[in-house]
Amino acid sequence: EGDLSIPWRRMLSYREVRDFSVRVRNMPRKWEGSNTAVGDAIAFSAAQFGRVSDCERKVIDMSGDGSSNAGLNAAVERRKAEAAGIEINGIAIDIIGASITAFYSRFVITSDGFVVTSRGFSDYPRSIREKLLRELIKPGS
């Protein structure tokens, strides 16, 4: 089951982005200990772009510490999103013995997307920063 925690918004100033980050940081977690339905998350996220059709880029950012064990097929939903012009990037939180990075690489990210590996939850802040910089800063050539 998907849920939109914060409604879509256009952020054009530093203050708007800062206020948004404070709100996100202080949000309670909606689910804990539930199933992992990556395909459902992709489908739910892709449907949200209908509300903001004038976006220059459509990017879904996925992060998780598990592969799918419920819901829609992640690879099928990824193909649908990609056909709709949506890029999917991810942060795979790899915990001892689990290769979530391999799952994300094979079934979640689109051909123009990428996955960043987080070595556990304590490494997540570094990983999210790396991912955001990679998405927002165009490399010089």
Predicted segment positions?
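Acidic helix-start/capping segments at beta-turn-to-alpha-helix junctions
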Residues: E1-L4
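Von Willebrand factor
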Residues: M11-K58, G90-I100, D123, S127
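Second-shell loop/turn segments in exported
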Residues: R25-N35, G64-S68, F114-S118
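DG-centered beta-turn motif at the end of beta-strands
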Residues: S45-A46, E56-A70, V108
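Loop/turn elements at helix/coil->beta-strand transitions in domains of secreted/extracellular proteins
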Residues: D54-V59, A83-N89, S111-F114
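VWA/integrin I-like adhesion module and closely mimicked acidic/polar interface patches used
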Residues: G66-F107
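Von Willebrand factor A/integrin I-like adhesion domains
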Residues: I93-G140
